[in-house]
Amino acid sequence: IKKCIDITKLRIITTLHSSIPEKHELVNKSKGSFHKSVAGLKNMYELGAKIEIKHCITKENIRQLEQFYLYCDNEFPENVNIQFCGIDYVGIEKKQLEKAFLSSEDIKEQLENTFDLYLNKRKHGSKRHLYAINIPLCACDVYYWKLMSLKKDIVYEGYADPYSNNLMEAERNVAVSEKYCRECKAYEICNGTYKTAFDYFGERLVKPYL
């Protein structure tokens, strides 16, 4: 790979569904993939690539959010970022939607507790960057908004075709809801979450700041 590209310009974002190998592999249906993924990320880091660990918060893993953060913090060098992300409900069978549903209130306690752990480590010298995307601001207290992506932030601009000079614009599938969020005091700065979440769960999804 090093002969073909400048690895230092690579930014690799890989999803780990859990810090528990069996739970990660239950999601991606690939036995042994957890340790292979971790080893692969470490190898790419040693080669000079920028590494980021993505963790989609689900009903299955929300209770282990602090554990996941601590695992990554102990396992990877400090300049490996950690990204928490809401989930897109597209592709989930309708009969399974209710089982998968998480409101902003459902994740608030665990998210804030994990942020507290992170901020305490920062206070004691840690250089790691942890942040959250595609999660409404009502999922945490205002104090933690510095760790949340805001409307002014551009997370993904589009897709660059490696075989041409074309840049394909990415369809914006994350937003706040005009119907359910308009009265919220954070409406103008909140990035919101996946539109599918609002489509399926409506006002149950959020708790606006009024």
Language-model segments: what does each one mean?
Residues 1-85:
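Radical SAM/AdoMet-radical enzyme domain recognition
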Residues 143-210:
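Flexible mid-to-C-terminal extensions adjoining Fe-S/redox cofactors in radical SAM and related proteins
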